[in-house]
């Protein structure tokens, strides 16, 4: 049986896989989670889904797919082992297959599949939703296996709630409490929260893709309109415009099954035709915003999909007899319209899967709850249900029907879950017989009521004959008018109307229109209530803010646009947003949720923790106990490891950037100086390796037109960017080889926001020296590694800073203290760590050894250069359990009056001997100081030896090589920054949903039942009959 800790770790990493495949198993579409799991970088290649399954499971998947295409079933369930990349998956949900070969690893999953239409509606595909399934997972004996693995942790909550309904009068049992989904901000019942959050994540991702395509359509329309306005009024001035260079358009009429061909008479008319098609798509998108929602209604989902087909179907094709200058525009527009339709269809298919899952859960829930009632009915006192005639009679009669009770419930309720059951109900009606003689069964009915022949029904289904005994109680069955039943489920709903109503209403099932289509990204500060100022820096302030729609608290960072007066500052801000977005969120990093432009400010919405930071903790408490420091250092190392695995170097690790959350654990923040070096190196290699013509040809072969679409859009802004580059680099030729936006072809672009970020980052780089060794150095002087001062940028600089942080937390002072920045750097170069006799005696030998090895001046010999495991195995961390690092409360749990209490952020500089007011880490370098840059100092001179306040902001301003922007240049640049900056981070919001699941887990009492055998749940298929669960 799975222990609770293992289940807890599983919940925190579980994701929903979505795969669309053709009948022969070719993957036509899959969400990024699938490609990440199998270890493929990207999502554009077509592969065989069967190749990633274990050989034994391949046959089951093909059989289920064939049944779906033959429409013998509507929903299929398959347990299968999916091959995965062990590097991308945590060890605790990877297991070797039964017969491993070539070192491949597999994950056991439950796949749920339905049949969906393809792009043109001609062919059909199977949409599979995959969810991790773990062996030896705790199972509730009375609950259906599929229902359990669908609800996840909610199964335990539902089980406990139904037990309360049975034990007490259901009228007096409150409905399940609700939890707020961070993605959609809807309140969902706890038992359904995991199902909803999985589907909600995919739904939001698909919505973002629809928005991204629509943005490209808007840009393309503006571009073509601009070209039309620049065309001369007559065709005499255009020598290239010939009869053969005009497009031939083929229009298909689906209703009459005809097609019409015609040639457009001029280039102007041709471009106007494209503008008209784009305008039609824009109007349809406006309709979609008011129509599409995540629905549980099957009819609503199908109607929605049909309307999208009718309004967005691309019913025309084009052809050119000779190459033409406008040929690319036709290719771009036609590709965009197809992509627009494809993204909407994927969204509708996902809604159909959500609807199928919802109905499946609902049917299983009714069966499970009623079976559960039948099991527990013998121990219920009838007096608890006084006033409810149906339940009272049922409880009374149940004592006399104990022998036939399983037959009654199992036979009756099984029919409610048969898909497409109209034919079966007709068969039941034909096979139902009346029995005139009931004396032989009189021994089962002791109450003395007069029975009629309609009290007994012989049901002959699935070639079996069973006698279901119904007790006729006055005021219940006879009043319900039980005739030869045309629909058994109708009888169930009538006989247990109050229970069914309770399950569907009081259990707070989601409504039909709980999720409207739209972008949830905030658009202005009006969506937040600014409560208190948390901190301020050189270029902005951080406020405690409350979101009006959800009531959640966030830290809102506001950066005035007027403060971004140089390219370096703009680059630092975009890097902060970019690196917070691409990191894999762990329990020890601050998450970024939203970024938006609000008039005069650029805003970042992040995690809020009111426990203060470690710098304030050291100020108020002095040197921290070694047990505290050991836990804090381990959590800091965990955060650094995750960042480095994503190629992110933090550059500014210090106690002021280590926040304390409400449970006492560390959260690393402030990514203003961070940089993704690995990504830049890869981009540089791609740019140098391939010429523009090679890239152009390869991309056409790979059918990736979306990159060209955005490149042409970006070229509209090229003039503005080139003006900015003139201040930094010599004039370049304007040929294709030096095209300032050609590098965009090197990227895998999923939406325009990501593309704009790449483009801006590249434009803000120095053009005259294309190297990735930084000329300047970033960070806070006291925590800089020696190689950073030499201009060498490595990940080991963060490890050095970690050693400095451990030293400061243990001693209350920094390892390199001085009155000036230059003096600090001189001590760093000499490796003059502040090891006084008193300091060494106050630390353990293990702590001294760890700090010394972490601060080795040679980065190649520094502890951790051979992997982070050698740091974790150091004796200083011997008491740390790395698998359960963040379980339980931390060393110091903040005690605040309420969420808005900011007591722990109050500095106490005057009352502490450990913090020098004139030291190099002043308030100017705290949380908002994300764009300072420091350069190696020149050799000391007598004039430099005097006292100096050494404010890092003043030092940076005097030495920084900045390019000040004029008002016009800033205006032009901000037009691109707005597109690159705003966005919503689904990964961070989903992480919050997982945290909610973990808190729900902590409140669950896990049953100690024996694990049910998988084979026990295989329903034997009866020849030529539809069976209940379709489980393979």
UniProtKB/Swiss-Prot annotation:
The keyword Cell inner membrane does not apply. GO terms for molecular function: ATP binding; protein serine kinase activity; protein serine/threonine kinase activity. GO terms for cellular component: cytoplasm; cytosol; nucleus. SMART domains: S_TKc. GO terms for biological process: intracellular signal transduction; meiotic cell cycle; positive regulation of autophagy. The active site is at 652 (proton acceptor). Residues 938-963 are annotated as: Disordered. It is found in: Cytoplasm. Its EC number is 2.7.11.1. It catalyses: L-seryl-[protein] + ATP = O-phospho-L-seryl-[protein] + ADP + H(+); L-threonyl-[protein] + ATP = O-phospho-L-threonyl-[protein] + ADP + H(+). Pfam families: Pkinase. InterPro entries: Kinase-like_dom_sf, PAS, Prot_kinase_dom, Ser/Thr_kinase_AS, Ser_Thr_kinase_AGC. It comes from the Eukaryota. ATP binds at residues 534-542, 557. The keyword Nucleotide-binding applies. Residues 947-957 have a biased composition (Low complexity). Keywords: ATP-binding, Cytoplasm, Kinase, Meiosis, Nucleotide-binding, Serine/threonine-protein kinase, Transferase. Residues 528-877 form the Protein kinase domain. Belongs to the protein kinase superfamily. Ser/Thr protein kinase family. Has a role in meiosis. PANTHER family: SERINE/THREONINE-PROTEIN KINASE, SERINE_THREONINE-PROTEIN KINASE CEK1-RELATED. This is Serine/threonine-protein kinase ppk31.
């Amino acid at each position: 049986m799975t222990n609770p800790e293992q289940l807890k770790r599983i919940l925190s990493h579980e994701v929903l896989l979505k795969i669309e495949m053709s009948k022969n198993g070719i993957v036509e579409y899959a969400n990024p989670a699938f490609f990440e799991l199998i270890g493929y970088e990207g999502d554009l290649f077509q592969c065989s889904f069967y190749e990633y399954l274990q050989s034994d499971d391949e046959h089951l998947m093909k059989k289920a797919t064939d049944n779906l295409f033959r429409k013998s079933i509507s929903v299929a369930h398959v347990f299968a082992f999916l091959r995965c990349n062990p590097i991308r998956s945590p060890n605790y949900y990877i297991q070797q297959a039964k017969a491993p070969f070539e070192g491949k690893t597999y994950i056991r999953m439950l796949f749920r599949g339905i049949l969906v239409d393809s792009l043109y509606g001609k062919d059909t595909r199977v949409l599979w939703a995959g969810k991790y399934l773990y062996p030896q997972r705790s199972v509730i004996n009375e609950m259906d296996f599929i229902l359990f693995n669908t609800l996840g942790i909610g199964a335990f909550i539902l089980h406990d709630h139904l037990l309360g309904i049975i034990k007490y009068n259901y009228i007096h049992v409150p409905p399940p409490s609700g939890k707020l989904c961070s993605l959609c901000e809807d309140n969902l019942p706890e038992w359904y929260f995991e199902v909803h959050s999985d589907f909600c994540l995919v739904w939001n991702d698909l919505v973002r893709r629809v928005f991204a395509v629509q943005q490209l359509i808007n840009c393309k329309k503006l571009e073509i309109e601009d070209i039309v306005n620049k065309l001369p009024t007559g065709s005499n001035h255009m020598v290239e415009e010939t009869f053969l260079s005009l497009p031939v358009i083929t229009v298909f009429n689906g209703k009459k099954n005809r097609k019409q061909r015609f040639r457009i008479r001029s280039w102007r008319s041709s471009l106007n035709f494209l503008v008209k098609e784009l305008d039609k798509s824009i109007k349809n998108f406006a309709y979609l915003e008011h129509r599409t929602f995540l629905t549980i209604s099957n009819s609503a989902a199908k109607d929605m999909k049909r309307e999208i087909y009718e309004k967005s179907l691309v019913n025309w094709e084009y052809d050119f007899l000779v190459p033409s200058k406008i040929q690319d525009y036709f290719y771009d527009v036609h590709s965009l319209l197809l992509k627009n339709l494809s993204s909407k269809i994927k969204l509708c298919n996902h809604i159909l899967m959500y609807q199928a899952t919802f109905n499946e859960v609902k049917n299983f829930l009714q069966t499970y709850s009623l079976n559960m009632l039948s099991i527990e009915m013998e121990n219920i006192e009838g007096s608890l249900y006084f006033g409810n005639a149906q339940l009272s009679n049922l409880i009374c009669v149940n004592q006399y029907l104990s022998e036939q009770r399983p037959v009654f419930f199992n036979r009756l309720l099984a029919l409610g879950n048969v898909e497409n059951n109209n034919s079966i109900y007709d068969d039941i009606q034909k096979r139902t017989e009346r029995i005139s003689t009931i004396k032989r069964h009189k021994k089962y009915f002791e109450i003395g009521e007069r029975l009629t022949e309609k009290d007994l029904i012989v049901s002959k289904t699935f070639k079996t004959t069973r006698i279901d005994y119904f007790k006729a109680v006055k005021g219940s069955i006879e009043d319900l008018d039980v005739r030869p039943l045309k629909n058994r489920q109708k009888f169930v709903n009538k006989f247990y109307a109050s229970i069914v109503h309770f399950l569907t209403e009081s259990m707070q099932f989601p409504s039909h229109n709980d999720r409207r289509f739209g972008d949830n990204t905030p658009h202005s500060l009006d969506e937040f209530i600014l409560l208190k100022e948390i901190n301020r820096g050189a270029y902005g302030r951080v406020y405690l803010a409350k979101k009006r729609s959800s009531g959640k608290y966030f830290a809102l960072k506001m950066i005035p646009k007027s403060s971004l007066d140089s390219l370096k500052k703009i680059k630092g801000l975009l890097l902060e947003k970019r690196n917070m977005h691409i990191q894999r969120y762990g329990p020890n990093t601050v998450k970024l949720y939203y970024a938006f432009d609000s008039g005069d400010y650029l805003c970042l919405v992040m995690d809020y923790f009111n426990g203060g930071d470690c710098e304030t903790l050291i100020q108020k408490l002095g040197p921290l106990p070694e047990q505290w420091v050991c836990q804090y250092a381990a959590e800091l190392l965990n955060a650094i490891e995750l960042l480095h695995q994503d190629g992110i170097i933090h550059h500014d690790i210090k106690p002021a950037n280590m926040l304390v959350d409400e449970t006492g654990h560390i959260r690393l923040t402030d990514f203003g100086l961070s940089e993704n070096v690995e990504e830049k190196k890869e981009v540089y290699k791609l740019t140098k390796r391939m010429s523009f013509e090679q890239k152009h040809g390869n991309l056409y072969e790979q059918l990736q037109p979306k990159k060209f679409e955005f490149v042409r859009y970006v070229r509209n802004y090229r003039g503005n960017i080139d003006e900015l580059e003139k201040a930094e680099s010599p004039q370049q030729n304007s040929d294709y080889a030096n095209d300032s936006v050609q590098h965009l072809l090197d990227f895998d672009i999923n939406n325009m926001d990501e593309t704009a970020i790449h483009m801006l980052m590249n434009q803000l780089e120095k053009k005259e020296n294309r190297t990735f060794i930084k000329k300047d150095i970033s960070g806070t002087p006291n925590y800089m590694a020696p190689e950073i001062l030499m201009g060498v940028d490595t990940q080991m600089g963060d490890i050095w800073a970690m050693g400095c942080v451990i030293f400061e937390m243990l001693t209350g002072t920094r390892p390199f203290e001085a009155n000036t920045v230059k003096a600090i750097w001189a001590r760093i170069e000499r490796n003059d760590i502040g090891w006084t006799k008193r300091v060494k005696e106050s630390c353990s030998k293990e702590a001294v050894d760890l700090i010394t090895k972490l601060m080795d001046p040679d980065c190649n010999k520094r502890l951790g250069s051979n992997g982070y495991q050698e740091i974790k195995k150091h004796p200083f961390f011997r008491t740390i359990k790395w698998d359960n690092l963040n379980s339980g409360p931390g060393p110091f749990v903040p005690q605040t009056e309420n969420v808005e209490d900011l007591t722990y952020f109050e500095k106490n500089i005057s009352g502490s001997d450990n913090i020098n007011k004139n030291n190099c880490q002043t308030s100017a370098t705290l949380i908002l100081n994300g764009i300072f840059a420091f350069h190696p100092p020149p050799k000391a001179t007598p004039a430099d030896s005097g006292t100096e306040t050494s404010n890092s902001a003043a030092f940076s301003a005097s030495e920084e090589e900045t390019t000040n922007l004029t008002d016009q240049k800033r205006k032009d640049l901000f037009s691109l920054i707005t597109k690159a900056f705003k966005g919503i981070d689904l990964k961070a919001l989903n992480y919050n949903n997982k945290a909610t699941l973990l808190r729900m887990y902590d409140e669950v009492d896990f049953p100690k039942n024996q694990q049910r055998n998988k084979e026990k749940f295989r329903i034997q298929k009866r020849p030529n009959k539809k069976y209940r669960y379709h489980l393979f």
